[in-house]
Amino acid sequence: MKLCGFEAGLDKPFFLIAGPCVIESRDMAFETAGALKEICVELGIPFIYKSSYDKANRSSGKSYRGMGMEKGLEILADVKKQLGVPVLTDVHAIDEIPAVAAAVDVLQTPAFLCRQTDFIHAVAASGRPVNIKKGQFLAPGDMKNVVDKAREANGGADTIMVCERGASFGYNNLVSDMRSLAIMRETGCPVVFDATHSVQLPGGQGTASGGQREFVPVLARAAVAVGIAGLFMESHPDPAKALSDGPNAWPLPKMKALLATLKEIDALVKAHGFMEMAG
């Protein structure tokens, strides 16, 4: 799959989608995008900047949602233009899709909306690549139905990615089944692993989600060892002060060291192929 000027697939080095959960300010957007770009250029990792203009599915109605679509898209467009990095953001409603698709390079669908047929059709028909997150309630094999819906709308174009972000495991907990990464390959789409939302404890703090940030490297290493096309990680300069999803965000100052390790694992695994795909 051609994505933002590079090739994405299991036979290529992994790409990174990273940035803060939500746009907190213009300055922080540029700070994080610039730092992540510098790291990825040094390590030779294809990079897409991610941040949200609105978090429509916060645990509490009193939680910070973002800067809003107009201001948020303006900031993302400026990051793209001034720093020369492709940008991704999530879209939550059909009527927002045209404006979002005009401003960013890649659209992302929230996991909760993966079964909404009209929404998937509309996002897929936007003309932009789409990262479809697997719902926490969905079996990995069921993502084929979601992808089929998307391909109905985009004429079968090679513009769809699928993303694993953990499965509900009782109340306020998620678990990552690494088999799902191999199973989701059967969609024919590049598979992305979300290493930060996978350690989330949904609603675990009552009015907000908790998280187990210390396990981000554990799951990231495991996913890269399984074999993935891309890695998604939310990162923040100071996660304790993040306005959204701080408990599961990976600290920006620690990003380079983790990515360097993951790059070595990725190269080793992909150099030897995948026995499970041998037939």
From Swiss-Prot:
Its EC number is 2.5.1.55. It comes from the Bacteria. The keyword Signal does not apply. Pfam families: DAHP_synth_1. It catalyses: D-arabinose 5-phosphate + phosphoenolpyruvate + H2O = 3-deoxy-alpha-D-manno-2-octulosonate-8-phosphate + phosphate. InterPro entries: Aldolase_TIM (IPR013785), DAHP1/KDSA (IPR006218), KDO8P_synthase (IPR006269). Gene3D superfamilies: Aldolase class I (3.20.20.70). Pathway: Carbohydrate biosynthesis; 3-deoxy-D-manno-octulosonate biosynthesis; 3-deoxy-D-manno-octulosonate from D-ribulose 5-phosphate: step 2/3; Bacterial outer membrane biogenesis; lipopolysaccharide biosynthesis. SUPFAM superfamilies: Aldolase. GO terms for molecular function: 3-deoxy-8-phosphooctulonate synthase activity. Belongs to the KdsA family. NCBIfam families: KDO8P_synth, PRK05198.1. This is 2-dehydro-3-deoxyphosphooctonate aldolase. It comes from Aromatoleum aromaticum (strain DSM 19018 / LMG 30748 / EbN1) (Azoarcus sp. (strain EbN1)).
